[in-house]
């Protein structure tokens, strides 16, 4: 018996280590802490200290006897002081921490189940030792007892229901839950239930230490919780942040990011401006949430989405779209060599022919800042009728009107070098990539004396000046400019009807035009008494609408060179286009121009002056097309002038591949539909800086980008997505109902001879046609000398 009595304390110490750990805290805790402290806090810290200090088996036995006495006292006195309640194990401490309303019942239940729980916990000595180490560290860092208890006994949501049932009497499975989850899931439960189940017992702690304890709990919960819980919490925090950040960012996005808002609205309809605001506000939240949830999105994906949006917008047309069935009623690009247009002109050829189809033009050398001339020349020489006309000049068809010193002849020689096929002889072969247009650049003073080859100029102004010079060279002296072949290619006729609101008189005018100028933004305002800086329309005339007026330099085109599609005002545009980032549709501006417009009298008594009643009054103006040009030049006014300086409007532009103007024509007998031929692009911030390039359609139907000396293949889709277009060239599609001019045999033979001469001019590398011209000149001189001899 003596041996058993001596071994029994050792066995009890090993088997009931958690019990001795808790019992030792009583004496230490009763000496150090106040009676007002929470029982679970005092008992828990005492357990840790007593376990570290006790080494005698007799002390362990004494503590066991004292615990039994205190348990009986607690059962007999349910309303006794809470400082006397001593948990027997970690599970009993759990019950004390998680129960608020029925703490006495929890104490009684814990006393009854202490033996079972202690045996279950004692079978895991590593966990108890790790608990002791953690408790010791926590005591050094923080003097509060409840902090260490939270570190280990935080419940999870799944076990809370079991613990509530344990308070009512179903506490049998608590020990199993603790043994399974004490080292795995307690940390997960801390982050979830810190504000749900532990808030009520925390209210009994001193107010001075509540804030510090809450901060420590958050730190411990984040350090103990598993990776999955951390990710879930971060996702929840991100979602909360998204909702708050989105509310703060939305007002700024509504002011600054108008491009996305407008692009969404225009997808619905360009005319439904009132519906835009409602639809955009709903759709704006989707990209914000997607960017927040997905984190950093792929920039390539964003670019592709933007490109798709731009393409969808650009493919839309306010005017009736040209469908495949409609296109079958027209001669397609380069389909019939005998296609001479819808105006029955016998002087123009609208298709390239078989010989040009196999040729590739060359680039043009940049002399420093001559990209504006190169882009304009490339756009003009990719018009089939212009190129055929220039080759006819080289073959001497227009020797009676065009001299060799003219700008037209210089341009013809430049075009010949551009289209010259590559020779098999390397000595005679020129550069296969580009040519030097030095002779054409040297004639810049004759084209426009206000321009300089050492300074960046306006490419559209150069194009119009070159067109004007070609028209002047092609008309004999004493003849009208509308008799020129240039008028057959670019010329149109506009009819304007102005009705006086005072007397009801109607004024009708007809004016030729060579391009259509579109403003991109501003208010509609008509000033008929303005000078040449604005586009005046007083019922009898219209000035030019190029970027800088051609009235001073080219009087031949100053009276009727172009039509301002913003109704005569430099500030006119669609009222909806107030944002600089809003995409501009040329179809909408054309429609706005041809709609009836009210000309109002302003405060300065400026308005329409009636020729009949001689009053300055209100009037209604209506415009229509009498003659649609074979080649339509659309100019976009992207530059504004403030005295001596200019600025560029950052306005994205959309334009269709096919443009329908039938509804704006006076006669509806023939449909008026156009196909895109060339796009000249300006890249830069101002008129005096930047760079010009040209997207042109090749004779074989493909598209190419001409960047001075460099030529790159480009797709038709990329051409339509170009946001920096400055001016565009459209060619009119000839309906198949129009008879082709093949009736007379003389015309047919003339066409064959002219075609053979053009092929000869292209194929022969050097000036063989010039030798023929020199022989003719020698014959003329010989005839003159012969006449002089006979007269003598």
From Swiss-Prot:
Q: Does Nucleotide-binding show up as a keyword for this record?
A: no
**Residue ranges occupied by any USP domain in the UniProt entry:** 362-733
The main location class comes to: nucleus
What is the similarity comment for this entry?
A: Belongs to the peptidase C19 family.
Q: Where is the composition biased (Basic and acidic residues)?
A: 144-171, 211-220
* Function text: Deubiquitinating enzyme involved in telomere and HM loci silencing, which is the repression of chromatin structure which leads to a stop in the transcription of nearby genes. Targets histone H2B for deubiquitination, thus helping to localize SIR2 to the telomere. At silent chromatin, including telomeres and the rDNA locus, not only maintains low H2B 'Lys-123' ubiquitination (H2BK123Ub), but also low H3 'Lys-4' and 'Lys-79' methylation (H3K4me and H3K79me, respectively).
Native species = Saccharomyces cerevisiae (strain ATCC 204508 / S288c)
Location of the region described as DHR2-binding module in the Swiss-Prot/TrEMBL record = 2-27
Quickly give the catalysed reaction.
Thiol-dependent hydrolysis of ester, thioester, amide, peptide and isopeptide bonds formed by the C-terminal Gly of ubiquitin (a 76-residue protein attached to proteins as an intracellular targeting signal)
EC number(s) for this protein? 3.4.19.12
Instruction: Let me see what the UniProt entry remarks about domains.
Output: Residues 2-27 within the N-terminal intrinsically disordered regions (IDR) constitute the binding module for DHR2 which is required to coordinate the UBP10-DHR2 interaction.
Source organism, top-level taxon = Eukaryota
Composition skew (Basic residues), residue ranges: 773-792
Designated name of the protein? Ubiquitin carboxyl-terminal hydrolase 10
State where composition is biased (Polar residues).
288-297, 530-539, 749-766
Q: Region SIR4-binding module: list its residue ranges.
A: 109-145
Q: Which UniProt keywords apply?
A: Chromosome, Hydrolase, Nucleus, Protease, Telomere, Thiol protease, Ubl conjugation pathway
Please give the annotated consequence of changing residue 371 to A/S. Answer: Abolishes deubiquitinating activity
